[in-house]
């Protein structure tokens, strides 16, 4: 007889299944909630559409690519990228015409960096360089015979383990973890493989291979920096520092001198290295070329330069010193902690444990004021020559190795017929110089224009500083054949000569006195020309006699405090807006600022600051927005049905009355999405048929490496190389290339270009910024911006403002003079907006004084919009962590209230909870709601005039769709929920069955 199944069996099985399905269901629900909360980031990562377009018109193309295929586009990108490095690389030294090398030269590539060339910096600006050639390949492509034994030694042999830290694509993190790690010279005696030995006679070790490839040693000296931390300027244990040669590198150069006919050094760095070694006979360097970071194709251009196929025409964008610590800005460069930091409730202002504000308990002082880079080195030099009081011990010749603007060529040029005059009708000066190629090869020449303004008793009495010379114009010739000439003409608006008087006139003034304009090869030659015009010679201590024939004197009879007090861009009055940068604003004593009236007595020193109650009010993140007392603002109309679409607004003025009709349709929730979730996009607004956009990074060309969804068509050389070209036409072409790349990849917004200042050589993000000079930075930025935006891309120029340090950069308080901020740190942004037409801005983490830059109305509204006329929108830097107190959204979103009321429009976040917080907190507040409406206006206006509207007409509609992954997650949750319910049902059923079975088999109570 078959045995029946025991009732109630399976309890253990269904218990296990119930627990398993419950755990899976709980995990799925948590995962789904997290994904839904960060839906925007997920959509970006998966390239998932959130809407579909109805009524799209493919003939409605407002911005069109210049290319019919990706192959054509990428070929043109490559050509321009190579030209960029070819014109930006700077020839520093070329003794005995070492360069160019003879065709077919047998060369050895020394340094591990030869096989690990730095193509970009670290962090969000990291680029895809998968198309970049190796250095060996680039050299072989132009006909050089490269030492294979040495190359194999670095790639597969004993030298492969000596790797630089950090490597590309990583964060700098802790500065103490920074290592150059060059291969010790002793390792070159390592025995080689049999195959390598067979490649040449008498090759037994790596060093013995040099004889067969001894025409030249090409030494690659690389330094990498980037987002997250500044370089350490203190000495390593061996007495060297990160921007000087290490002992291993010194030994390597000595070895090269012994073994090779000539030594060529390539400086693969955007942080100015100390150049004391280049002319030291101990190392025997015959030629040196600065190449910056090379991007995808820059190495091809470098090889072309060495071969003579390209004549270098770049000029330095920074002052290169023998000792970088001579810069006054380094005295107080790194962050200082408030002296009463430990006495306070640090949770109020410091939350690094939660990924928050590492700089909110810190401050920095720019005591050097305007004296950044050559503005310091050349000014103090002139004061020494003129015998100014209190100039101190200062020897220019032993301090500066290569001045700002320096650059050599393979040919020679003669300048003549300098002309300059003032044109009252245009209120500008015209400068012209005839340039003739007097050498034997074709080349391009750069003419730089500088001015000097009078340093008066009024200046000394009222805290106005004047640099000895300032760049005010430049021009570059076409490629001139030997014997060919060209007249270079430079226009200099007289407004360039004005200075900012923050203490008395509180605006820009043009003082009475003599102004000098000169054409020069570099900043030092400019000073010498002016000194010559004043009657000084080498007998007075000049490094060389200047040429007074290349100077022009303009005399301004009366101090003018009116003409330049009105913005030429908007007609608005220009006056002080940045009082919070002055320590007296918070009740402290006046900060000592470096002055040329007393170099020795005002040299910067570390300042100890105790955070007082006034300062704590501004830096305390845990505050609640309580509304505006006495406000009469009315709630705007929202959610109306006016039949408007964004397509109807294409090409209309910002102040067109139809904008109000359109904005009346937008709901509060949609405004909150635009304001609160600006991470790499602008959100869809279905009520007005606005599509979502894709926005991403791009100091070296459009890159999506941060979001990981695509590669770029081309990665260009760094911004230092861009500026070093001194070629605005080329930079506009680079911009057009980037715009075409973005059109093809379906992107509308670019987080860049960046244009902060090289305050010192040690800033982590100098590779993202053009120069130490704001005029050059602004002109190059304006050209690049104009080119990019010609393809319907809106650029976010960044980081606005004072983001000149990486260490403790998140909400560090910055103190300096308004003159320094306006003349040095804002000027590049101003030029990019007023001349380049930049549409958007990315704010900085930094504080101006104690006020976060994004909440500083003087900066974001009065200067950016009032004085400069920006009509687009501004976005915060990354604010994706709720711990970004007073920066990201925190308790009761106080910083969002501050930011919106000051003029910030969108937060670089993808967190759904932030949008919800906005909706919950401010929905009944008319002032905040009106600010959100204006932010929405700016964003919609920008997008309406971008390539995002290609295919859109007045009749085009946007319909929201549920992303596939949301449907999939919901299905998974439902299925797991059903399985949990089913397993519980079966478990209960089995338990009941088992109990019933036990009851049937149990003996009766009276049964014996």
Model regions: which residues?
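Glycoside hydrolase catalytic-domain context in secreted enzymes
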Residues: 1-500, 509-517, 523, 572-1008
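Terminal connector regions
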Residues: 494-565
């Amino acid at each position: 007889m078959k045995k029946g199944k025991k009732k109630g069996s399976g309890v253990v099985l269904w218990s296990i299944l119930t627990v398993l399905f419950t755990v899976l269901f709980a995990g799925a629900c948590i995962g789904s909630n997290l994904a839904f909360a960060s839906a925007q980031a997920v959509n970006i990562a998966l390239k998932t559409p959130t809407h579909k377009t109805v009524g799209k018109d493919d003939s409605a193309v407002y911005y069109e690519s210049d290319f019919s295929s990706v192959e054509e586009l990428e070929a043109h990108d490559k050509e321009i990228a190579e030209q960029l490095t070819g014109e930006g690389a700077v020839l520093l030294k070329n003794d005995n015409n070492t360069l160019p090398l003879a065709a077919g030269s047998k060369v050895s590539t020394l340094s591990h960096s030869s096989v690990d060339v730095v193509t970009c910096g670290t962090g969000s600006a990291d680029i895809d360089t998968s198309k970049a050639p190796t250095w060996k390949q680039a050299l072989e492509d132009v006909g050089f015979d490269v030492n294979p034994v040495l190359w194999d030694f670095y790639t597969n042999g004993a030298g492969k383990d000596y790797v630089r830290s950090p490597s590309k694509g990583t964060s700098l993190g802790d500065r103490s973890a920074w290592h150059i790690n060059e291969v010790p010279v002793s390792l070159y005696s390592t025995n080689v493989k049999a195959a390598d030995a067979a490649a040449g006679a008498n090759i037994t070790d790596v060093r013995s291979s040099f004889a067969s490839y001894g025409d030249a040693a090409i030494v690659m000296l690389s330094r990498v920096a980037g987002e997250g931390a500044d370089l350490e300027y203190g000495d390593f244990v061996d007495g060297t520092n990160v921007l000087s040669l290490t002992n291993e590198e010194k030994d390597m150069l000595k070895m090269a001198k012994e073994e090779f006919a000539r030594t060529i050094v390539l400086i693969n760095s955007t942080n100015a290295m100390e150049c004391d070694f280049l002319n030291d006979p101990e190392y025997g360097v015959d030629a040196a070329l600065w190449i910056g970071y090379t991007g995808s194709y820059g190495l091809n251009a470098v090889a072309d330069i060495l071969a003579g196929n390209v004549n270098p025409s770049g000029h330095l964008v920074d002052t290169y010193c023998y000792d970088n610590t001579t810069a006054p800005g380094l005295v107080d460069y790194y962050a200082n902690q408030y002296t009463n930091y430990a006495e306070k409730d640090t949770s109020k202002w410091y939350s690094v444990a939660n990924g928050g504000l590492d700089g909110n308990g810190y401050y920095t002082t720019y005591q050097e004021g305007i004296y950044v880079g050559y503005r310091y080195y050349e000014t103090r030099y002139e004061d020494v020559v003129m015998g100014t009081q209190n100039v101190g011990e200062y020897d220019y010749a032993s301090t500066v190795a290569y001045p700002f603007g320096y650059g050599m060529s393979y040919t020679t040029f003669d300048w003549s017929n300098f002309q300059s005059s003032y044109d009252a009708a245009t209120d500008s000066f015209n400068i012209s110089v005839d340039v003739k190629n007097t050498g034997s090869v074709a080349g391009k020449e750069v003419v730089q224009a500088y001015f000097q303004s009078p340093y008066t008793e009024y200046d000394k009495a009222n805290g106005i500083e004047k640099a000895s010379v300032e760049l005010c114009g430049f021009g570059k010739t076409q490629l001139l054949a030997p014997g060919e000439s060209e007249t270079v003409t430079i226009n200099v608006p007289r407004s360039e000569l004005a200075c900012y008087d923050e203490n008395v006139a509180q605006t820009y003034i043009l003082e009475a006195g003599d102004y000098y304009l000169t054409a020069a090869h570099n900043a030092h030659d400019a000073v010498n020309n002016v000194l010559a015009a004043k009657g000084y010679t080498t007998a007075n201590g000049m490094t060389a006699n200047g040429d007074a024939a290349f100077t022009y004197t303009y005399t301004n009879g009366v101090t003018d405090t009116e003409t330049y007090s009105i913005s030429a861009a908007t007609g608005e009055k220009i006056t002080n807006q940045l009082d919070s940068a002055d320590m007296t604003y918070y009740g402290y004593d006046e900060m000592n600022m470096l002055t040329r009236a007393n170099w020795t007595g005002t040299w910067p020193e570390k300042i100890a600051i105790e955070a007082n109650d006034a300062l704590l009010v501004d830096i305390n993140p845990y505050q609640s927005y309580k509304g505006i007392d006495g406000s009469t603002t009315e709630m705007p109309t929202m959610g109306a049905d006016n039949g408007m679409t964004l397509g109807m607004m294409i090409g209309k003025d910002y102040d067109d009355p139809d904008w109000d009709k359109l904005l009346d349709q937008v709901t509060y929730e949609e405004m909150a999405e635009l304001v609160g979730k600006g991470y790499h996009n602008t959100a869809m607004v279905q009520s007005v048929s606005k599509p979502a956009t894709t926005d991403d990074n791009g100091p070296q060309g459009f890159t999506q490496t941060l979001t990981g969804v695509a590669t770029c068509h081309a990665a260009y050389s760094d911004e230092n190389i861009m500026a070093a070209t001194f070629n605005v036409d080329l930079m506009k072409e680079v911009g057009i290339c980037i715009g075409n790349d973005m059109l093809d990849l379906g992107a509308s917004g670019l987080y860049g270009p960046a244009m902060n200042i090289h305050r010192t050589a040690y800033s982590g993000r100098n590779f993202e910024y053009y120069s130490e000079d704001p005029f050059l930075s602004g002109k190059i930025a304006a050209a690049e911006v104009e080119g990019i935006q010609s393809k319907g891309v809106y650029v976010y120029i960044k980081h606005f403002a004072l983001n000149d340090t990486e260490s403790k950069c998140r909400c560090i308080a910055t103190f300096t003079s308004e003159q320094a901020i306006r003349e040095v740190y804002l000027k590049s942004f101003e030029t990019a907006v007023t001349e380049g037409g930049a549409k958007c801005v990315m704010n900085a983490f930094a504080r101006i004084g104690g006020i976060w830059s994004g909440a500083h109305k003087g900066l974001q509204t009065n200067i950016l919009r009032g004085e400069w006329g920006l009509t687009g929108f501004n976005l915060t830097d990354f604010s994706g962590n709720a711990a970004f107190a007073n920066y990201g959204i925190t308790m009761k979103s106080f910083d969002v209230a501050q930011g919106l009321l000051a003029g910030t429009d969108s937060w670089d976040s993808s967190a759904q909870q932030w949008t919800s917080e906005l909706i919950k907190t401010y929905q009944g507040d008319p002032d905040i709601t009106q600010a959100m409406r204006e932010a929405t206006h700016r964003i919609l206006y920008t997008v309406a005039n971008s390539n995002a509207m290609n295919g859109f007409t007045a009749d085009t509609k946007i319909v929201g769709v549920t992303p596939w992954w949301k449907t999939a997650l919901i299905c998974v949750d439902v299925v797991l929920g059903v399985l949990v319910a089913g397993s519980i049902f079966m478990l209960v059923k089995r338990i009941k069955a088992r109990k019933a079975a036990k009851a049937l088999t149990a003996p009766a109570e009276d049964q014996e």
